[in-house]
Amino acid sequence: MNTNARFGWMLIGTCIAISAHGGEVPVKLASGEQAALVQSRCSVCHSLDYIVMNSRFLSRTAWEGEVRKMMKVMGAPVSENEVAPIVDYLTQNYGVK
């Protein structure tokens, strides 16, 4: 494949990727004392949509399990001292009602 054709395909791929991402609506977390902490820790690895999408399914115990899984399995940058405040925020704002 010549250089011009390769460049053309790269340009097309870039345009598709940009347009696919452009349609996303940013998620604004519920206000709360720990909202900034949750946003800064969770958004390192995934969209904040994950929190909203799972909110109707997760109890306090389940949220804690999710946070610990993200730490241990996925390597999330959450310290042990941050687990309780994050779980408190998630349970209060996004836990099973």
Task: Please provide the spans of the model-predicted regions.
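Alpha-helix N-cap/helix-initiation sites
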Residues: 35, 56, 79-83
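Bacterial N-terminal signal peptides
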Residues: 9-19
